[in-house]
């Protein structure tokens, strides 16, 4: 794709563009013509990176022009660079003002070369609408001054443009990953009815938190998740354990942010650990097609050595936390074992059940309930052990296994949609009993949030990428 162009190539492309503009003005009298190209120095005008930035730019231009009637919209992708031609029924100067706001308001907008042609064929300039010349990409002086004096090499300008493109999409990826993590936490608490857990109906077995406490916490944690994704991006191609080490201090700061938001209540300590690792793993995998199995296994590579070390220390009588004490007494590894194993419960149980429920036609709430029941049936939840003892946790698991068996049979018979109402009634009754007993499967709730995060990232991938609303030209 990175074919070099000559001066005659560019001159021919410019003339073809001018002819297309004249044709559109003749076809649509009184309309304004918008032409989008990329401001890329040098003989290489079309690469995968440039096309990616152009797709983003075209989507933004169309969003800006959305209030106007679009009369024509087409794009070409030649070696001289991608171009879009859009004709709208609008006053040309008003259009130019809007598009200059795009060019000046977004960092990547500096690479967009947007011309607006008035009905008389004249090009509306920035000075026509009272704006100064655009700034140089390298020194921030007026770009025309640097261009005339050739103050910078073509290679330096080309390198800077590509760095800007990379930075934009990496930032968009990190922001979108954080949005999905926050969305996962909000959806997890919204899933109702959940036995013993905070949901939209009640606070379950908890007397120090409710659904609003969770909302406050999830909002406070979004910057942390974005930071985790950025840390993963910075460790692409590097040591996974070093990436995990880099998460430790941000994780402690996130716990502090959570407690500030909740008045000291621990709503998401487990999710700070699990989803933080997941966001970093997603960052480490950036640039390749999303593979959830690989993403979760990379979580194991990141944490495995340290988690095994902590569990072995607990076994040797050096337990520092309740989770380590449980491992010392009962051999239940909890979230440490889950992480070290690449979150097998998410890969093999929660996510497949969530996807099966959605495929069966269930709404997200009900599919997530099915996934939660499957987790409660198959995992040893240290939070349930802490609150209900080993016997209480075992009883919870047994009841979940019975209910999960019914869900599996309903799925196999293609009857889950018909039976989900009755299953939810049983979950409501179970919630009353679990709440009265003070048992809360918080570890399973965190794993459900992990499954939701992976599902949302897969959804993004299916919609064209995990980079926000960059769109396609």
Residues covered by each model-derived region:
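Phosphate-rich cofactor/ligand-interacting catalytic cores and adjacent structured alpha/beta frameworks
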Residues: 163-240, 244, 282-432, 473
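Long, hydrophobic/aromatic-enriched structural stretches that serve as scaffold segments
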Residues: 227-284
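Short, conserved charged micro-motifs
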Residues: 46-47, 92-99, 290-294
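Asparagine/serine/threonine-enriched low-complexity, disordered tracts
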Residues: 460-472
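Short, hydrophobic/aliphatic alpha-helical segments
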Residues: 247-264, 423-437, 455
